[in-house]
């Protein structure tokens, strides 16, 4: 997802590379996985969306249903964020296909992203396109629409990641990026601030699994009684982590090869 391909590489670059990744993996196992199981459990037990799940499951007199209101607000805010970033990516696919980025160096591509952010009209247009496409997929339902399309797109994503990772590792200077990405340097973590690194790793662990906002409760409501909640959660966490680590293995070495700051921020993947 976007949390892996777009956000994880620049978070790893910003917070010190391998040291950040180690802390991130610890939070995934200790907090991310259990919360994911819990959200699936709530969804499967209630067979309802986040808006009604806690109303149906809570004991009489309890106030767990208050979470549903915060959850719905969080999901709307999250979709505002996701649709904008997805719009950036769709726009870059169009720009690449149209040859607008052909022959440009990293500085020129970075300027191109800056100009995109300065154009509210362009960003709004591509965000609307993403929303329309998303509604089209969701209108088919989870199993007939989202599940089928996701299977095809995931296979394409994994194949693309494999090709790009191999190419990135063959670039001149890429091994310095691999060292930064895979060899922990706790000295740099102290310079950045241990608290900042821990908070960044924790927020990324929750963000990448889409937990805490109740969205996984919706998917849990479609899980059959024969499916293991722990097993499904482990599969999701492992695949999610694999994609994140591979995305970093593409972006970080390429940054060192082209002289781009690995912690350059949200525009890093577009450079």
Which residues make up each language-model segment?
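Central hydrophobic cores of alpha-helical transmembrane segments in multi-pass inner-membrane proteins
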Residues: 28-40, 50-52, 130-139, 213-220
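Transmembrane helix-boundary motif of multi-pass solute transporters/channels
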Residues: 1-27, 176, 214-220, 232-234, ...
């Amino acid at each position: 997802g976007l949390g892996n391909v777009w956000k994880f590489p620049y978070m790893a670059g910003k917070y010190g590379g391998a040291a950040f990744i180690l802390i991130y993996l610890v939070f995934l196992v200790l907090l991310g996985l259990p919360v994911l199981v819990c959200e699936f459990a709530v969804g499967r037990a209630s067979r309802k969306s986040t808006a009604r799940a806690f109303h149906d499951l809570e004991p009489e007199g309890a106030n767990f249903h208050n979470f549903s209101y915060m959850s719905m607000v969080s999901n709307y805010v999250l979709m505002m964020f996701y649709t904008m970033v997805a719009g950036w990516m769709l726009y870059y696919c169009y720009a690449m296909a149209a040859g607008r980025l052909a022959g440009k160096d990293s500085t020129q591509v970075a300027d191109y992203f800056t100009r995109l952010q300065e154009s509210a009209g362009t960003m709004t247009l591509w965000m609307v396109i993403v929303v329309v496409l998303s509604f089209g997929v969701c209108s088919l339902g989870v199993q007939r629409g989202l599940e089928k399309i996701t299977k095809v797109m995931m296979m394409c994503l994994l194949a693309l990641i494999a090709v790009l990772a191999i190419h990135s590792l063959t670039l001149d200077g890429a091994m310095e990026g691999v060292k930064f990405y895979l060899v922990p340097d706790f000295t740099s973590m102290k310079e950045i601030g241990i608290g900042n690194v821990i908070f960044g790793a924790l927020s990324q662990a929750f963000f990448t699994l889409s937990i805490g906002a109740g969205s996984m409760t919706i998917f849990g409501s479609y899980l059959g009684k024969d499916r293991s909640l722990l097993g499904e959660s482990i599969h999701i966490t492992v695949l999610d982590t694999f994609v994140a680590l591979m995305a970093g293995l593409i972006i970080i070495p390429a940054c060192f090869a082209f002289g781009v700051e690995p912690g350059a921020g949200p525009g890093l993947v577009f450079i």
